[in-house]
Design a protein with these regions (language model features):
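Positively charged n-region of N-terminal signal peptides that target proteins for export
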Residues: 1-4
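Short glycine/threonine-rich turn/loop motifs
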Residues: 22-127, 193-290, 296-297, 317-333
């Protein structure tokens, strides 16, 4: 447990030492009005860091028994969700929250359903790796073992040197999470029919209803989320979200706020089911009616669903740059 705490502190506090990679990164062309995402203090982007993060994201080496990778919970074809109500960890313990998609996470500072302080991708990545409530990847206290595993791999030795030139102490949690965070920031999705102005008439009608019925008061902005935590009247959580305390058990007497959850993005929402914080809504319509039945009593549901489907970016779901890395180790980047 102590090792896990030290690791989380490292991910939060040592990012100022991680910004020395080559300044060779260029963001892709973004839609009009969308600025490049701000980077947390001390972080940077580079092609080498992204390549390392991509390989780590798809490698079960980051889990206790080598059975779970980040990509097992975040599946590209499903908008980087997993198609399950909640995910089972390496010890068989069931998760408590539905896995969210990852489209455009570079622009977000609220990264979990209820988090109270995990505002960077680097800090958030520590929760699935080292969290104990629930156990996901099961690496709590295994700092030295993680470094040993990665250092024993010739490809990782080379990729870490390229991503963090000048570093002499090998792989650390801080560098692992910096690389994964860099890769996740490349997961940009602005190619849906909605973005391209290619919505069919039924979807356009649904968009008007979406705005008129008040949905856009919370599902606002380019990613259809205000990033805030709201009372939505779905179901009170039975236990604290692990992200509230970095995956550690909550303090004695802690009671989670009833029924308050962060507004999820609606990007690619049609493929990220089952829906809501607990994954207990098997369809988008059931999720809508579960938390907004009164507001939408007169809505044309087929039109609203057509609009939500128009937020699906098919290119994002198949873009090979977000998929598994080549089996062979890449040459110099």
């Amino acid at each position: 447990m102590r090792g896990s705490t030290i690791a989380i502190m490292g991910a939060l506090l040592l990012t100022s030492a991680l910004g020395a990679a080559r300044p060779d990164w260029r963001w892709p062309a973004l839609p009009h009005g969308i600025a490049a995402p701000d980077l947390p203090a001390g972080t940077s982007m580079s092609a080498a860091k992204v390549a390392l993060g991509r390989r780590l994201f798809y490698d079960p080496i980051l889990s206790q028994n080598g059975s779970m990778a980040c990509a097992d919970c975040h599946v590209q074809a499903l908008g980087f969700s997993d198609g399950q109500p909640t995910h089972v960890g390496v010890t068989g313990e069931m998760g408590v929250r539905n896995v969210p998609g990852l489209a455009n996470v570079a622009w977000r500072s609220g990264l979990t359903w209820t988090e109270a302080g995990l505002t960077t991708l680097e800090a958030q990545a520590m929760v699935p790796m080292t969290g104990v409530k629930p156990v996901e990847m099961g690496m709590a206290g295994d700092d030295a073992d993680l470094a040993r595993r990665l250092s024993a791999d010739a490809c990782y030795r080379r990729l870490f040197m390229q991503a963090f030139p000048g570093a002499t102490d090998g792989p650390t949690y801080a560098r692992v999470t910096a690389a994964i965070g860099a890769f996740q920031r490349t997961m940009i999705s602005f190619g849906s029919p909605y973005d391209r102005g290619a919505m069919p008439p039924l979807a356009r009608k649904g968009a008007a209803q979406f705005a008129a019925s008040g949905c856009a008061s919370c599902h606002s902005g380019a990613d259809f989320t205000d990033g805030q935590v709201h009372y939505v009247g779905t179901a009170a959580p039975r236990e604290a979200d692990s992200s509230l305390y970095g995956g550690k058990p909550p303090p004695p007497g802690f009671e989670p706020p009833p029924e308050q959850f962060r507004t999820p993005s609606l990007r690619n929402v049609a493929v990220t089911g089952p829906w809501l914080h607990d994954g207990k809504s098997p369809s988008i319509e059931s999720a809508i009616r579960r938390h907004a039945a009164v507001q939408l009593v007169n809505v044309d549901m087929p039109a609203l669903l057509a609009f939500l489907d128009s937020l699906t970016d098919r290119e994002f779901l198949t873009n090979r740059t977000f998929g598994p890395p080549p089996a062979t180790c890449p040459a110099a980047i």
